[in-house]
């Protein structure tokens, strides 16, 4: 390790600029620059020119000398002394160098962790091999919700409960224009919420390249611009996310199938679309494409949402079939071929032909290229990094958060995990509690859940009682002329405490957070029933569902308390 003494720096931003300049010098592997101490600690290759180091610093207007070199002039100018006095007044007397935190990734978990670590006083290096922002803003949540919204509007123009007095019209879909509008909003949000924030934070240095562990204290970064750099750290967070999984179906890899990434970026709407998958991404996009004009066939190995309460899958299946989406339950593709611009799927129910094939059967952690074994970081059989509730891995100084772990794959979970990981990396003690985690699927009707289903509660030895309220009992749904779906409450028998809610409703995502707060605050179903809810809102359905435990809500007048 080579140390430089640097005079003239006046702030942490100065140190960041010096670090950047030194790391551009040939032979410099990494640099840790401390403004309070006035030093730069360098990992350099043998033969690196000391003159090149001091010249790089001098080019920024500062003076640098090797720490073990004899002083050439003991006289310090008044300006330098004043800079030293000002710096000493602004900083703690301990003059300890900032904790060096490396974050691999730039999505929800990574950004939350980087910003929290800086808030806690750390210096952060963020490493991203691709586009800043991760899955959510670029190829996930944001573009998919825009496409779903477009499809919803197209559907209402074509068909609504008010067609008798407002005749429907067949919409013209200009997919290229819609895609341009979608991508413009993606780029706007990426800059506002990711790139702009990183650019404006002097305590965060961004490296564009692919990282792999050298050991449990350093990384090797293959820079996108060429060459490699060794980056040392005190703490490291792995937040590399996940990618679409590809099932081992013969012929699939040789075909031009879509994942969600390609589907969201397509500038055309296929006439026929086959979808392999039976959960969130598959079903959101299946319905969106159907509403934009595709003839959609969904292949489900089991039933739709087979891991959830059976009533959820039944309700969504009924809604899909009512819109003309073909749902093939208990159906698997055993062979995929692509001939003459057409997909041919061999299934347990015969042959299926389509113009495009969307495969959305889950996601796999982005951990294979990280050389985690070099740092002693354990993964499970699926390649997900094993962590505890504090996001700690099996290696003491390395943490992980988000979709590269076995945490639920929601961006808000990833962000919460990243924040708590940063607290723990900087000396705190925070845990991630997912006992009241909401989940929303943006089909129409939407699916929203929190807490236990009945089956999950019974698996954990909890005796339950439950009620299911269909939406024809909810005034808001009646006023909307859309009574598809239900609200189901699960309570602990004996105590009456609410422990789970499952909802299928056009606006289920807007009501579930009330259920989250009720569960978090250990409310009984009677306490929920006694609350004031505004009339003609969908969330009032929670109150009505709670009332069904003690009375027949069909016999109540409007908004009866």
Curated annotation (Swiss-Prot):
Superkingdom field: Bacteria
Boundaries of every HMA domain copy: 1-65
Cofactor: FAD
Disulfide bonds: 136-141
InterPro entries to which the protein is assigned, alphabetical: FAD/NAD-bd_sf, FAD/NAD-binding_dom, FAD/NAD-linked_Rdtase_dimer_sf, Heavy-metal-associated_CS, HMA_dom, HMA_dom_sf, Mercury_reductase_MerA, Pyr_nuc-diS_OxRdtase
Transmembrane segments: none
Reaction catalysis annotation: Hg + NADP(+) + H(+) = Hg(2+) + NADPH
Gene Ontology BP, a term: detoxification of mercury ion
CDD domains membership: HMA (cd00371)
Enzyme Commission designation: 1.16.1.1
Oligomeric form and interacting partners: Homodimer.
Remarks, miscellaneous: The active site is a redox-active disulfide bond.
Protein name: Mercuric reductase
Organism annotation: Enterobacter agglomerans
Gene it is expressed from: merA
């Amino acid at each position: 390790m080579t140390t430089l003494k640097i005079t003239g720096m006046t702030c942490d931003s100065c140190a960041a600029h010096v670090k950047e300049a030194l790391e551009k010098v040939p032979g410099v592997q990494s640099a840790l620059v401390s403004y309070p101490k006035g030093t730069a600690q360098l990992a350099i290759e043998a033969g690196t020119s000391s003159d090149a180091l001091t010249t790089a610093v001098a080019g920024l207007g500062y003076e640098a000398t090797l720490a073990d070199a004899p002083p050439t002039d003991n006289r310090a100018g008044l300006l330098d002394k004043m800079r030293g006095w000002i710096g000493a007044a602004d900083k703690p007397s301990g003059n300890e160098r900032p904790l060096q935190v490396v974050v691999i990734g730039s999505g929800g978990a990574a950004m939350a962790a980087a910003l929290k670590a800086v808030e806690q006083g750390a210096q952060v290096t963020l490493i991203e091999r691709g586009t800043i922002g991760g899955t959510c803003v670029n190829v996930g949540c944001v573009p998919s919700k825009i496409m779903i919204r477009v499809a919803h509007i197209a559907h209402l123009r074509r068909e609504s409960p008010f067609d008798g007095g407002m005749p429907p019209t067949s919409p013209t879909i200009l997919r290229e224009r819609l895609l341009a509008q979608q991508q413009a909003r993606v780029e706007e949000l990426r800059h506002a919420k990711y790139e702009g924030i990183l650019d404006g934070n002097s305590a965060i240095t961004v490296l564009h390249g692919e990282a792999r562990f050298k050991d449990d204290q350093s990384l090797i970064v293959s820079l996108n611009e060429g060459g490699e750099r060794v980056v040392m750290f005190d703490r490291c967070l792995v937040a590399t996310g996940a990618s679409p999984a590809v099932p081992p179906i013969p012929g699939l890899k040789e075909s031009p199938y879509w994942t969600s990434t390609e589907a969201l970026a397509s500038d055309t709407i296929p006439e026929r679309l086959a979808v392999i998958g039976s959960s969130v991404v598959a079903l959101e996009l299946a319905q969106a494409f159907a509403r934009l004009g595709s003839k959609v066939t969904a292949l489900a190995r089991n039933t739709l949402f087979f891991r959830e309460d059976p009533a959820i899958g039944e309700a969504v299946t009924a809604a899909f079939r009512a819109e003309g989406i073909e749902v093939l339950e208990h159906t698997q593709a055993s062979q995929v071929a692509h001939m003459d611009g057409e997909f041919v799927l061999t299934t347990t129910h015969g042959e299926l032909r389509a113009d495009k094939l969307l495969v959305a059967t889950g996601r796999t952690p982005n951990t294979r290229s990280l050389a985690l074994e070099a740092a002693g970081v354990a993964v499970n059989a699926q390649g997900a990094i094993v962590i505890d509730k504090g996001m700690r891995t099996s290696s003491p100084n390395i943490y992980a958060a988000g979709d590269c772990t076995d945490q639920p794959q929601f961006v808000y979970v990833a962000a919460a995990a990243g924040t708590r990981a940063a607290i723990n990396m900087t000396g705190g003690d925070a845990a991630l509690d997912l006992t009241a985690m909401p989940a929303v699927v943006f089909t129409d009707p939407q699916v929203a859940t929190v807490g236990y289903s009945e089956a999950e509660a019974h698996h954990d030895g909890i005796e339950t009682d439950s009620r299911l309220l269909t939406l024809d009992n909810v005034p808001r749904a009646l006023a909307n002329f859309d009574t598809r779906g239900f609200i189901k409450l699960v309570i602990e028998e004996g105590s009456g405490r609410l422990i789970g809610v499952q909802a299928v409703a056009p606006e289920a995502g807007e009501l579930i957070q009330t259920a989250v707060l009720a569960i978090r605050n250990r409310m009984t179903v009677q306490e929920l029933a006694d609350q004031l809810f505004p009339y003609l809102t969908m969330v009032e359905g929670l109150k009505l569902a709670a009332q069904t435990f003690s009375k027949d809500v069909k016999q109540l007048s409007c908004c009866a308390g």
